[in-house]
């Protein structure tokens, strides 16, 4: 009987957790950006109201979900994409190949490297189809949450890990980053291809980074942050949420707070205009700018 009650409690906790962590947001327009390992890799597109690609071009934003390089879904950034599309960007949230438990990567590749390769393909597809989408390929923003933050960083900083089928004349350079507690793991140093520290440069495009002060990944972020500053980077805007853990931006008022701060950051970079259309929560949550 006690075992049954314990099991029911675990189910209840799991259900409550799922209910709290629902990302929300409607799916965007689905496109296939490549086929790898026999499966279609898709992204979802969101357009500004009344956007006419034949009459105007706007900046593009492509985001990558988290999930430990082996899980996660597109719905993590659907709300963000819908919001930034309403503000004037063409947005995409892209999936990528994830290796399940016990599944080995192709010979000569790593579990995380496979993710990065697909992310590079997604960014290239976004740029290659700029005319149809009505975006400026020279004003692309990227980012992601947790593992997605790591993947977006390596996809734009590491010149290797390319899919041979990708167009070689299209690069993965971007003009800004939106990083939501990016996960830079210390064990990555064993593999330079996926190690952020190997690919840091002082001329990083402007970035805004969100972390909870109780996030276990924050220490590893600070290692990269310190090296970036040593290299002369001065355009990384680090924001800290007091009392918050990893993934805090996914739910409740913190999602709104981080989207507003990201909006203001993009306005500062000349990639958006006007004021955020979201309203800061009345409950008083706010981010603290880190030195």
Describe each region flagged by the PLM:
Residues 28-34, 39-42, 60-135, 156:
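Serine-hydrolase catalytic machinery in alpha/beta-hydrolase-like enzymes
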Residues 20-56:
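N-terminal cap/lid segment of alpha/beta-hydrolase-fold proteins
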Residues 121-199:
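Primarily recognizes the serine-hydrolase "nucleophile elbow" in alpha/beta-hydrolase
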Residues 44-46, 222, 231-291:
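C-terminal catalytic histidine-bearing segment of alpha/beta-hydrolase fold enzymes
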Residues 203, 208-211:
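Short beta-strand/loop motif that positions the catalytic acidic residue
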Residues 4-13:
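Sec-dependent N-terminal signal peptides
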Residues 216-222:
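Conserved alpha/beta-hydrolase "acid-adjacent" motif
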């Amino acid at each position: 009987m006690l075992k049954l009650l314990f099991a029911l409690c675990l189910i209840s906790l799991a259900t409550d957790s799922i209910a709290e962590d629902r990302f929300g947001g409607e799916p965007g327009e689905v496109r296939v950006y490549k086929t790898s390992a026999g499966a279609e890799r898709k992204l979802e597109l969101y357009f500004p109201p009344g956007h006419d690609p034949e009459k105007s071009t706007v900046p593009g934003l492509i985001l990558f979900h988290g999930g430990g390089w082996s899980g996660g879904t597109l719905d993590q950034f659907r709300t963000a994409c819908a919001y930034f599309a309403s503000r004037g960007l063409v947005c995409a949230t892209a999936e990528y190949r994830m290796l399940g438990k016990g599944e080995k990567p192709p010979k000569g590749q790593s579990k995380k490297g496979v993710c990065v390769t697909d992310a590079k393909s997604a960014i290239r597809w976004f740029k290659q189809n700029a005319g149809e989408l009505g975006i400026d390929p020279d004003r692309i923003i990227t980012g992601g949450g947790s593992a997605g933050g790591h993947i977006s960083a390596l996809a734009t900083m590491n010149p290797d890990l390319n899919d041979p089928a990708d167009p070689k004349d299209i690069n993965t350079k971007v003009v800004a980053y939106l990083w939501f507690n990016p996960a830079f793991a210390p064990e990555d140093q064993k593999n330079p291809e996926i190690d952020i520290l190997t690919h840091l440069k002082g001329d990083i495009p402007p970035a805004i980074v969100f972390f909870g002060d109780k996030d276990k990944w924050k220490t590893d972020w600070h290692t990269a942050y310190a090296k970036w500053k040593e290299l002369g980077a001065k355009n990384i805007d680090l924001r800290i949420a007091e009392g918050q853990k990893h993934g805090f931006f996914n739910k409740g008022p913190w999602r709104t707070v981080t989207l507003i701060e990201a909006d203001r950051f993009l306005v500062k970079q000349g990639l958006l205009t006007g004021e955020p259309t979201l309203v800061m929560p009345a409950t008083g949550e706010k981010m603290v700018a880190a030195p």
